[in-house]
Amino acid sequence: MKWLKQLQSLHTKLVIVYVLLIIIGMQIIGLYFTNNLEKELLDNFKKNITQYAKQLEISIEKVYDEKGSVNAQKDIQNLLSEYANRQEIGEIRFIDKDQIIIATTKQSNRSLINQKANDSSVQKALSLGQSNDHLILKDYGGGKDRVWVYNIPVKVDKKVIGNIYIESKINDVYNQLNNINQIFIVGTAISLLITVILGFFIARTITKPITDMRNQTVEMSRGNYTQRVKIYGNDEIGELALAFNNLSKRVQEAQANTESEKRRLDSVITHMSDGIIATDRRGRIRIVNDMALKMFGMAKEDIIGYYMLSVLSLEDEFKLEEIQENNDSFLLDLNEEEGLIARVNFSTIVQETGFVTGYIAVLHDVTEQQQVERERREFVANVSHELRTPLTSMNSYIEALEEGAWKDEELAPQFLSVTREETERMIRLVNDLLQLSKMDNESDQINKEIIDFNMFINKIINRHEMSAKDTTFIRDIPKKTIFTEFDPDKMTQVFDNVITNAMKYSRGDKRVEFHVKQNPLYNRMTIRIKDNGIGIPINKVDKIFDRFYRVDKARTRKMGGTGLGLAISKEIVEAHNGRIWANSVEGQGTSIFITLPCEVIEDGDWDE
C-alpha cells in the first residue's frame, strides 16, 4: 500500500504530467517532422526520376528523328542501358504506340521484346498522351520492395510514338525514413529518461515546501506549533510558506492565549466557593467543579454525562427549555445526610444567532445562611416565649392583687414573692441576652490576668461546697501549680454555671467530681467536671450549648434556668482560645470538658 500511496502523491503526479506533456509534444513534433520529411524525400525522389525520364524522352526523340522507327530499336536499347546505370533504377522499358516492347534494361526480361505489354498504366499513358505513376510491390531477389512506376509518353511532331516505362526503387527512401524514425525514437527515449530524472528534481522543488507544510499541518493537528516551514524562494510557493509560517505563529499565540484563559478559567471554576455545572445543549453535564462534587457527595465519573435536571432532582418541576425563560432561583436539599441546602441559579449559553449551545447552573451553599436564619427565628421565638411566660404569670398575680387579693394576709405575700421571682428571672434573662449580644458584637471586654489555676478552682469549689451540704465534691487536682491567663470574673461565671448545672441535675447521693490535667508539651490543660445526674440522650449532647436549648424544658424552667448559661460559657471559653464539650451516658451522668491554654512560668519569672 505504501507504493500506491507514493504513486498517488503530488510529486509523482507532477512527474507523470511532466513526462506526458513531453511525450505528447515530441509525438506531435515527430509526426509533423516525419510526415514532412517523407513528403520531401518522396517529392525529391520522384522529381529526380521525372527529370531523368525527361532527358531520356528527349534522347529517344532524337533517335527517332535521325533513324526512324524501324532502325531505332538498337539505339534505343543502348540508350536505355546507358540510363539504367543508376542505383535507384530497377528497369526501363520503351514501348511503341502499339504497346510492343521495343527495349528493356533488365536481362531477364529480354525475352519480352517484340511482345505486347499488357499494362493498364502503359495503355493509359499511350491513349491519353499523359504521364502517370503508381506504386507496386516487386521482388528483385531480396524480397518484395516498394517500386515506383512512372510512365511518360514520347511524342514526335506532337504524335505519340511510344512510352517510357520506368521502375524505380523507392523503397530506399522508406528505409531512410525508418532509420530517421528509429533515431528519433531513441532520441525521444533518452530525452524521456532525462526528463524523468529532471522531472523528479523539478517536482521536488515544488512539492518539498508543500510536503513540509503538510507535515507541519499534521504537527499542528497534534498541538505542536513550534515547527516552521523552510522558505526556498521568493515565488508563489515561497510566499505561501511564509504565510503558512505566519499562520502557524498566530495559531500558536492564539492557542497559548486560549490555553492560558482555559487554565485561568479552570482555576477560577475549581477554586470557586460556589458549585458550577455546565452542560451541552441537550442538558448533559460536561463540566463540574470540585465544590459541586463536594455538595453532591459524588465522584466526577458518577455525574459527567448525566442529565442535569435529573441530578438536581428537578426533572419533575420543569423542562430544560424553560430554563431560558425562567430566571428564578431554587432552594434545593442537595445532601440530606449533611443537611446541605443550596440556592441554584440557571443561565443559558446562547450564540449571536440565538442558537442555544448549553446551560450553566450555579450552586451557592446557603446552609449556614439558612441555619442562621432558622436560629434567628428560633431565637426570637424563644426570647418571646421566655419573656411571655413570666410576664403572663406576673400579670395574673397583679390582676389578682388589684381585684382584692392584696387584702388577704396569706395570699398577698405569696403573690408578691412569685412576682419578684419572675422579675428576677426576667432580669437574669435580659442580662444573659445582653452579654451574648456583646460577645456576638465582640464588644465584651476581656481583662486577662496570670492566675494560679489550682488556687482559683479550689476557691470556687470551696464556695459551692459550703452552700451545698447535700453534695459531695471530689477533687483530682495536681499539687504542682498550674498558671494560666484569663479573665477571672468571666471564667468564674463559666465554672459556676457548669457546677450549678451538675448539682441541679444530680440525684440520690449527689456527687460532683473535678479532674484537672496539664499537657506541658502543648501548653494546654483539661478540666473535667462530672456529675452522677440523669444524663443526656446521645443525640442531644451536642445541642446543649445552643441558645435556649433545654433537654427537659419544664424541669429547667422550674429550676430557674434561662437556657443561655452553657451558650454563654461556650462563648467565654472560645474567647480564651479554649474549647468546651460534653460526654454523657443517659442514666449515669454527664461530663463537661474544658481545655484552656496554660503558662509555663519559672520561679525567676515572678517580679519581687
Curated annotation (Swiss-Prot):
GO terms for molecular function: ATP binding; metal ion binding; phosphorelay response regulator activity; phosphorelay sensor kinase activity; protein kinase activator activity. By zinc. Zinc-binding negatively regulates WalK kinase activity and thus autophosphorylation. CDD domains: HAMP (cd06225), HATPase (cd00075), HisKA (cd00082), PAS (cd00130). Residues 261-331 form the PAS domain. It catalyses: ATP + protein L-histidine = ADP + protein N-phospho-L-histidine. SUPFAM superfamilies: ATPase domain of HSP90 chaperone/DNA topoisomerase II/histidine kinase, HAMP domain-like, Homodimeric domain of signal transducing histidine kinase, PYP-like sensor domain (PAS domain), Sensory domain-like. Residues 314-378 form the PAC domain. The modification Phosphohistidine is found at H385. The chain crosses the membrane at residues 14-34, 183-203. Residues 204-256 form the HAMP domain. One of its GO terms (biological process) is osmosensory signaling via phosphorelay pathway. Member of the two-component regulatory system WalK/WalR that regulates genes involved in cell wall metabolism, virulence regulation, biofilm production, oxidative stress resistance and antibiotic resistance via direct or indirect regulation of autolysins. Functions as a sensor protein kinase which is autophosphorylated at a histidine residue in the dimerization domain and transfers its phosphate group to the conserved aspartic acid residue in the regulatory domain of WalR. This is Sensor protein kinase WalK.
